[in-house]
């Protein structure tokens, strides 16, 4: 059993903790929290609570939440740390991990240079093998890699042009925006293009990003120039070999991200998460070697399976297909067509 500590229990950290706890070959040794809030109160029922340092202990004790120790105590009891702290904090934390000689996974908000490899389970599982420091790429990059990898593998890719309509913030965040505006990123390509190349080496790609006043999901409009001609059926069949890509058909009645998240609720998933990248089959258009499609991305959860697979790769205990199958089985990710 791999002993996994979770430093940071926000949107990603709490989901990774849950996913790790479901695996047969891993155990959660504890989580690090900074505030004795409602999240800490609920989490303390399932996980041991640790704090960044002793100065945080009294606030937790006053709230009636037992503290097991500091992050250094958690490191002592773990073999790897998943650092899901806010963007930029992981870089500060890395010094401690290096000093204590413990493996660590960082999330996509950190710069690629923080790690020895960036990671996506489908496109570059082997690059994280036996590494000490790995970065799981962002939700948007994960989504693009998921659907582009099968196309590159089967047809080859000459060029990708993706427009990313980003959600403004997560559902539980009442501080960020925009609330009543559309906010384009004026840097073209957006940061997603170079980030995608960290897990799909040499890919010729450009991206445009636009923030929209919604909290539910991102939406991508993707245009791909393949190296060889394909049909619409060829493209869809390539995706159907991968469980983490979900085909949404006309008969589903799903035409919005609101309905897409309602589908996740109907699955009965923990936190109503949709780990899969949902591609509207009606949107798939193929003319010769040019492919266009639209996909929806649940930014809170699509990177969660990747974190689990990254752990196995770093400890060299499974190949890609076996690890992905193990993870998918526990998270109830199945081949689905709607």
From Swiss-Prot:
One of its GO terms (biological process) is glycolytic process. This is Glyceraldehyde-3-phosphate dehydrogenase. Transmembrane segments: none annotated. SUPFAM superfamilies: Glyceraldehyde-3-phosphate dehydrogenase-like, C-terminal domain (SSF55347), NAD(P)-binding Rossmann-fold domains (SSF51735). NAD(+) binds at residues 11-12, 109, 167, 299. Disulfide bonds: none annotated. It catalyses: D-glyceraldehyde 3-phosphate + phosphate + NADP(+) = (2R)-3-phospho-glyceroyl phosphate + NADPH + H(+); D-glyceraldehyde 3-phosphate + phosphate + NAD(+) = (2R)-3-phospho-glyceroyl phosphate + NADH + H(+). The active site is at residue 139. It is an enzyme of class 1 (oxidoreductase). Its EC number is 1.2.1.59. GO terms for molecular function: glyceraldehyde-3-phosphate dehydrogenase (NAD+) (phosphorylating) activity; glyceraldehyde-3-phosphate dehydrogenase (NADP+) (phosphorylating) activity; NAD binding; NADP binding. Coiled coil: none annotated. It comes from Thermoplasma acidophilum (strain ATCC 25905 / DSM 1728 / JCM 9062 / NBRC 15155 / AMRC-C165). It is found in: Cytoplasm. It comes from the Archaea.
């Amino acid at each position: 059993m791999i002993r996994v500590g979770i430093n940071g229990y926000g949107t990603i950290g709490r989901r990774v903790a849950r996913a790790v706890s479901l695996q047969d070959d891993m155990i959660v040794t504890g989580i690090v929290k900074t505030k004795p809030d409602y999240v800490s109160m609920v989490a303390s029922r399932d996980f041991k609570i640790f704090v960044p340092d002793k100065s945080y202990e009294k606030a937790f004790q006053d709230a009636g939440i037992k503290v097991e120790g500091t992050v250094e105590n958690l490191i002592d009891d773990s073999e790897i740390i998943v650092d899901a702290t806010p963007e930029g904090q992981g870089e500060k934390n890395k010094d401690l991990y290096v000093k204590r000689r413990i493996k660590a996974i960082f999330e996509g908000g950190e710069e690629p240079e923080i790690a020895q490899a960036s990671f996506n389970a489908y496109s570059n599982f082997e690059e994280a093998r036996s590494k000490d420091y790995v970065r799981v790429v962002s939700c948007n990059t994960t989504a693009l890699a998921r659907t582009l990898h099968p196309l590159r593998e089967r047809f080859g890719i000459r060029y990708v042009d993706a427009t990313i309509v980003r959600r403004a913030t997560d559902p539980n965040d009442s501080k960020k925006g925009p609330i009543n505006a559309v906010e384009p990123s004026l840097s073209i390509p957006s940061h997603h293009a170079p980030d995608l190349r960290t897990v799909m080496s040499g890919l010729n790609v450009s991206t445009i990003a636009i923030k929209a006043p919604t909290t539910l999901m991102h939406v991508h409009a993707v245009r791909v120039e393949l190296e060889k001609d394909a049909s619409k059926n060829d493209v869809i069949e390539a995706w159907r070999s991968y469980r983490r890509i979900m085909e949404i058909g006309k008969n589903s009645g799903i035409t919005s991200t609101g309905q897409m998240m309602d589908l996740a609720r109907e699955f009965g998933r923990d936190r109503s998460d949709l780990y899969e990248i949902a591609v509207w089959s009606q949107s798939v258009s193929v003319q010769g070697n040019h492919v266009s499609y639209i996909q929806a991305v649940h930014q809170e959860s699509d990177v969660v399976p990747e974190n689990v697979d990254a752990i196995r790769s770093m400890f060299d205990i499974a190949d890609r297909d076996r690890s992905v199958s193990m993870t998918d089985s526990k998270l109830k990710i199945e081949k689905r067509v709607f």
